[in-house]
Amino acid sequence: MITTRTARQCGQADYGWLQARYTFSFGHYFDPKLLGYASLRVLNQEVLAPGAAFQPRTYPKVDILNVILDGEAEYRDSEGNHVQASAGEALLLSTQPGVSYSEHNLSKDKPLTRMQLWLDACPQRENPLIQKLALNMGKQQLIASPEGAMGSLQLRQQVWLHHIVLDKGESANFQLHGPRAYLQSIHGKFHALTHHEEKAALTCGDGAFIRDEANITLVADSPLRALLIDLPV
């Protein structure tokens, strides 16, 4: 079963220095029916104004994945670690109790645009605090997984995350690990097909809940960039 969640249905925020779209309840936006999906707690697309920053804050024990779409960001923690990431890169922060984290748009004249996901982390697992990965913009890529398969970022949860780039008319099929997945369009138009012959059309910024499907096929109706989050847990 596929249930779409259009970009217009998502929560919105505009603070001047920050513009955001929230898939699930976050900040001032609250919907008791949308507190996350399986281990996916947050899926935001945010634009930080030139020079803007998120001040240091602590997090619950989650893995925070930032996919940089445009611009360059710097991340720092209270332990003295810092790293920069730019467009075409994904950065994973394995947050720790009592450690605060900040984010800063390094450019003085260009906005920073990125997707941010929070995934519940298994309390027994300890991974590298910061991991970074270059995205392959020419094909499908597994960018995060429980064991760091195929050079992907290593998560503290049973989740597989795919970065998908397709030209118009191309298709891609994915075998899912369990009963749940979430599909997020970054840009482009496409349709998703299930083995039950169910079809859903998505466009830029739309998402879709996938339930009780063994596999999913994406067919690009225009040049496409998307994320598929395989969420058995």
UniProtKB/Swiss-Prot annotation:
Its main location: cytoplasm. Transmembrane segments: none annotated. Keywords: Cytoplasm. InterPro entries: Pirin, Pirin_N_dom, Quercetinase_C, RmlC-like_jellyroll, RmlC_Cupin_sf. Gene3D superfamilies: Jelly Rolls (2.60.120.10). It is found in: Cytoplasm. One of its GO terms (cellular component) is cytoplasm. SUPFAM superfamilies: RmlC-like cupins. Belongs to the pirin family. Monomer. Does not have quercetin 2,3-dioxygenase activity. Contains Cys residues that are easily oxidized. This is Pirin-like protein YhaK.
